[in-house]
């Protein structure tokens, strides 16, 4: 590819309706079972045929496995501790899905 001078590049970007987003800290791509986190990326927005195309480049990449808590686990914690649905779910999330830890945490504060 031939090198382009900055003026030509700027003109081409304007013709293609391209612009770069500044100050982007991270981009998170959420999948069903995990998240891909791209830190300090370069993000370019291209408008083509009425659609916006986001091009993400570079940065550090990190994957996080998404915690999946089953309804059965939430119900079990509710039955064992007498708490409501949201409290049981939150306790399981804080315990990374560990049933025993969630139940102990909720019952430790009880008389």
Swiss-Prot record:
Domain NAC-A/B as annotated: residue spans: 3-69
InterPro entries reported for this sequence: NAC-like_UBA, NAC_A/B_dom_sf, NAC_arc, Nas_poly-pep-assoc_cplx_dom, UBA-like_sf
Gene3D superfamilies noted in UniProt: DNA helicase RuvA subunit, C-terminal domain, Nascent polypeptide-associated complex domain
Biological process per Gene Ontology, one example term: protein transport
Subunit structure: Homodimer. Interacts with the ribosome. Binds ribosomal RNA.
Stated family: Belongs to the NAC-alpha family.
Protein name: Nascent polypeptide-associated complex protein
Species the sequence originates in: Pyrococcus furiosus (strain ATCC 43587 / DSM 3638 / JCM 8422 / Vc1)
Name of the gene: nac
